[in-house]
Regions:
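Internal acidic/polar
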Residues: 2, 80, 88-112, 116-117, ...
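Short amphipathic alpha-helical boundary/capping segments
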Residues: 4-8, 114-123
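Short, charged helix-capping/linker segments at alpha-helix termini
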Residues: 10-19, 29-48, 59, 141, ...
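Short amphipathic alpha helix immediately N-terminal
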Residues: 21, 121-142, 146, 171
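Hydrophobic positions on the alpha-helical face of helix-turn-helix-like DNA-binding modules
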Residues: 49, 73, 130, 143-144, ...
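DNA-recognition helix of helix-turn-helix
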Residues: 75, 79, 126, 135, ...
Length: 174
């Protein structure tokens, strides 16, 4: 069904494009949420992906599965959004009189939030690998397809991320 909708959307059929977006929106939003940790940011990222999809649908050639290609679009949009937020945060901190300190984590939900926040603070490639493998449940091979690298590179990025998270969080098991 996707193949037919893609072909029609590539030909300019707006109804087919709308159906394609509807079929995959929840996937895009869930992926965006996993990367951002915020439903508001996920809404923004998903909207950006839908707009971008309209501009680039004609470039999809079927070399990979559509969902893998869409994953890559979402990943890139999430990265761009994260960079934008980092720039805004820098600007805010430059003008803020006293930055607020986060409250310490106390329960399991807060620990989980602390862990995912630490994951999102990792270097970009490590963050991507961890979110794809642990957040999205992809195999190292599937994560490598999305990231455009080898399976060994994904394994190494995950290993390095785990070491860094153990240090940052002060935990034996991460």
């Amino acid at each position: 069904l996707d193949a037919e909708l893609i072909e029609r959307a590539q030909g300019g059929d707006r109804e087919a494009f709308g159906q394609l977006v509807s079929r995959h929106y929840d996937f895009v939003h869930a992926t965006a949420w996993r990367w951002s940790g915020s439903s508001t940011d996920a809404d923004d990222i998903a909207q950006e992906v839908c707009v971008k999809l309209g501009a680039v649908i004609r470039s999809f050639r079927g070399a990979s599965r559509f969902r893998t290609w869409l994953y890559t679009l979402t990943l890139n949009a999430a990265r761009d959004h994260r960079r934008k937020l980092a720039r805004e945060e820098q600007t805010f901190r430059a003008y803020a009189a006293e930055p607020q300190q986060d409250a310490p984590a106390g329960n399991d939900d807060e620990l989980s939030s602390e862990l995912w926040a630490a994951v999102r603070a990792l270097p970009e490639r490590q963050c991507d690998a961890v979110l794809l493998v642990y957040g999205e449940g992809l195999s190292h091979s599937a994560a490598a397809d999305v990231m455009g690298c080898s399976e060994a590179t994904v394994s190494w990025q995950v290993h390095e991320a785990r070491k860094r998270l153990k240090t940052v969080l002060g935990k034996e098991e991460v």
